[in-house]
C-alpha cells in the first residue's frame, strides 16, 4: 500500500508494513520504488494514532516514498524479536519496546516517549534526531545524525527491570549535538560532534568517556567517568561550575581556547590538560590526587585559580598567576616567557623547580617549598615589596637580574645560593640557616639590606655596595671577593674567620670585623672617618695603599699591615 492508517490495536506474530509506490517481493518483502508519476504524495506513509498500537513478536515498518513521514503515536511492542523502521521522511515515535534490537533509519527522527531495546539500539537520521523523554537499551546504543538534540535520557546498559549491567556502550556521531538531559553508558560513552557539542546543564556519564569534535560548551554541565575521560575539541567553555571529572585518568586537549573560569577539571589518578590559551581564573580548578600536567601557550590562573596534584608539571609560554595557586608535593613550572606571581602562590611539599624568562613575584608573591627550591631565569626576578622565596631545604636562585628591594625575602632553612649579573638587595633580606653564597656581577646591599648565613658566607661578585646600613653577616666563616667594595656606614662581620680579596675597599664609618682571624688583600683600602677593621684573632692586611685617617685597625692578637 502507498500509505497506512491505524486507529486500533494491531496484533500479529510478525508484523510487516511496507508503504510507498513500490513493487514488493512477497517472499522477502524487498521493495523496489517505482518512478514518480506526478501524483500527489500522501502526508504520511504510516499514521498510527494514540489508539493504534502495534503488538507482535517482531515488527518491521518500511516507508520508501521520499519525503513522506511516519507517525507512530500509539504503543509499539515487539515481544519476541526486533523492531526495524525505515522511513524516507520524518519518523515521529511515541512509545516503543522490543525484546531484541531496535533499528531505525529515517530522514529525521523524533522520539517523544519511552523507547527501549532489549538488545541494541541503532538510529540513523540524515537530518536531526530528537529525544524528548527516554531511549534505553540493554546492550549498545549507536546514534548518527547531522544534528542530535537530547532533552531527556539516553542510557545504554539497562536491563528490562531497570537494573544496570556492565556491557552497555553509547556512541553518538553528529555534526552538532545538544544535550540538555543525560547521556549514560554503563561501559564506554563516545560522542563525536564535528562542529559543536552543547552540553549546557547536561551530563555525560560512563565507565569511560570520550568526546571529540569542534567547540564544546559545558557551562553548568558534567562529563563524568569512572575510568578514563578523554576530551579533544577545537575549544572548550567550562565556566559556571562546569565539571569534567574522572575517578582515574582525564585527558583534556583543545586546539584553541579552554575557558575554565569557575569550572573544574579533575583526574583523580592522573590529569593532562593542553590548550593554546587556558584560563583557569575565578576559582577554576585543575586537579588530581596524583599527577597533574598542564601545557599551554598562555596559562591564566589568577583570581584564586588552582592547579594542584601530588606531582604538578606546567609547561607554558606565559603564566599569569596573580592571586592564584599552584600546589603539589613536587612542582615543576617551565615557561618560555614571563611569569606573573604577584599575590600568587607556588607551594611544594618536596621540591619546587621554576624556570622562565622572567618572574614577577613582587607585592607578596610567594614561592614556598618544604624541601628544595630552584629558580632559573634568563632575565629579571622581581621580588620587591615583600616578595618571598622560602624553602626548608636547599635553595638555588640563578637569574639575569634580582630585584629584592623593599622587604623582599630569600630564605632557606638550609643552604642559599644566589647568582645573577645584577643583585639588588637594597632593603631586602637574604638569609640561610646553613651557608649563603652570592655570586655574579654587581651586588647592591645598601639601605639596610641584609645577607647572612649561619654556616658560612661566600660572596664573589664584580662589585659590592654595602653602604648605608647594609649588613653582610656570617655565624661561621666569611669569604669575600670583589673588584670594588663600598661599605660606608655598613657592616661586614664573621663569627669565624674572614678573608677578603678586593680591588678596593671604601668603608668610611663602616665595619669589617671578625671574632677570629681577618685577612684582607686589596689594591686600595680606605678605612678613614671612623672606619673599623677589627678581629679577636690576628689581622693581616696586604694593600698597595691604605688610608686609615681617623679610622681604627685593632686586634686582641697580632696586627700586620703590609702597604
Regions found by a protein language model. Name each.
Residues 1-413, 417-475, 479-536, 540-563:
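Extracellular and secretory-pathway beta-repeat/beta-biased strand scaffolds
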